[in-house]
Curated annotation (Swiss-Prot):
Its main location: membrane. It comes from Oceanobacillus iheyensis (strain DSM 14371 / CIP 107618 / JCM 11309 / KCTC 3954 / HTE831). It is a multi-pass membrane protein. It holds the Pfam family PDZ_6. Zn(2+) binds at H18, H22. The active site is at E19. One of its GO terms (cellular component) is plasma membrane. The keyword Hydrolase applies. This is Zinc metalloprotease RasP. The keyword Membrane applies. GO terms for biological process: proteolysis.
Length: 424
């Protein structure tokens, strides 16, 4: 149960912060945001605030921000349509009744002759009992369509995605991944405040019970200064030697309470994979890195850790694309849930660390220039900036549709790999 709650909380935060970035920059640019959704599929919960419908949906596979103009409008008025009009106190059309006009007895029913809801915001037509006097009505920029008793706000061109400059559109698309990096930095800052920041020297933190380190007599705050004939000055040097010597006795010199002591330990053997995904055996002795409280160091740690994690993920992604790493090592929702279950059992700090890493992963993946991802859409905005004119919407739509289908296929393959690896 704890894992389920942790997974839902983690998923909700990662997706919400990503989509919130898109939402905020869309609204700052003056775009009409029709919906802010967490999840896909049927709605579980919804409410409307400041023009936007906020929804939580059943399938936890992402989220989206639906901006006016990105997709064809569902409701389209054409000459010959019979519609009902309701007006505000200024005499402007405030509601356009598309059907079920009998439920709106005070609506003025007309037959549409001409309509422009993009630029001029007018509706022209004739009353049903008078086909000689052509009437013209000004439409309020926030007027509502009413169809099947559901209200949908009209979207004048100046509120649509395509009406904004390439810079504003690019920023709206980039804002989602950007917020994932901001979240990661914030989490690392929180970790720095809670547990301190890692010290550069090979200083031991917590000693795990029933491990070679405990059996050899290591204590927290011991500082490793030498292994064999090699001087040790950093944590990376210490862990590298331990990893490379599973089952081999290592003679170490430590500093404890200002005095040097000799101590020997035999690293245990643990299964792992190398940088290309091949199984290897590494050495472990069961110690955590030492930490210290440092206000300035906390901020540096947050940024450095985000940068290091970003670099690592990009390198792994490059190896995947070039075939150096098998697609079988990819994890989908099932694999991420299983990993979350293992992380939750190791403590809150590790759960925060795992959340930060996934947030960076989400940000990077969305910036990859693939169809249906933020990076793919940024690619089209960039091409428009270079060409001086946009790609035909029909061509871009096909590109994203095919890409989305391929991504869904990849998700199915990855999920099946997870199921085989974990359950079969």
């Amino acid at each position: 149960m704890t894992t389920v709650v942790a997974f839902i909380l983690m998923f909700g935060v990662l997706v919400s912060i990503h989509e919130w970035g898109h939402l905020i920059f869309a609204k700052r640019a003056g775009m009409l945001v029709r919906e802010f959704a967490i999840g896909f599929g049927p709605k579980i919960f919804s409410f409307t605030k400041n023009e936007t419908l906020y929804t939580i949906r059943l399938i936890p596979a992402g989220g989206y921000v639906r901006v006016a103009g990105e997709d064809p409008e569902i409701i389209e008025l054409k000459p010959g349509h019979h519609i009902g009009l309701e007006f505000n106190q200024a005499g402007e059309v405030s509601k356009i009744i598309v059907n079920n006009k009998s439920k709106h007895p005070y609506a003025r029913v007309i037959e549409v002759e001409n309509v422009d809801l993009d630029h001029k915001l007018i509706i022209e037509g004739y009353e049903l009992d008078d086909d000689e006097n052509r009437l013209s009505f000004n439409v309020n920029e926030k007027a509502m369509f009413v169809m099947d008793e559901r209200e949908t706000q009209i979207a004048p061109y100046n509120r649509q995605f395509a009406s904004k400059s390439t810079g504003k559109r690019a920023m709206q698309l980039f804002a989602g991944p950007m917020m994932n990096f901001v979240l990661a930095i914030a989490i690392f800052l929180i970790l720095g405040i809670i547990q301190g920041v890692p010290v550069e020297e090979a200083k031991l933190g917590e000693i795990q019970p029933d491990t070679p380190a405990e059996q050899a007599g290591f204590q927290q705050d011991d500082v490793i200064t030498q292994i064999g004939d090699q001087s040790i000055s950093t944590w990376e040097e210490f862990t590298s030697i331990v990893r490379e010597n599973p089952g081999q006795e290592l003679d170490m010199v430590i500093q404890r309470n200002g005095e040097s002591q000799d101590i020997s330990v035999v690293p245990g053997e643990a299964e792992a994979v190398n940088e290309v995904g091949d199984p290897i055996t590494i050495g472990q002795i069961g110690v955590y890195q030492g930490f210290e409280k440092d206000v300035l160091g906390t901020f540096v740690y947050g940024i450095e850790r985000t940068y290091d994690t970003t670099t690592m993920i990009i390198q792994n992604l490059f190896m995947l694309v070039t075939g150096q790493v098998s697609i079988e090592l990819l994890s989908g929702p099932v694999g991420i849930y299983d990993a979350t279950d293992q992380v939750v059992q190791t403590g809150f700090s590790n759960f925060l660390l795992w959340t930060a890493m996934l947030s960076i992963n989400l940000g990077i993946i969305n910036l990859v220039p693939l169809p249906a991802l933020d990076g793919g859409r940024l690619l089209f905005v960039g091409l428009e900036a270079v060409r001086g004119k946009p790609i035909a919407p029909e061509k871009e739509g096909i590109f994203h549709f095919v890409g989305f289908a391929l991504l869904m296929l990849l998700m199915i393959v990855v999920t099946w790999n997870d199921i085989q690896r974990l359950f079969l």
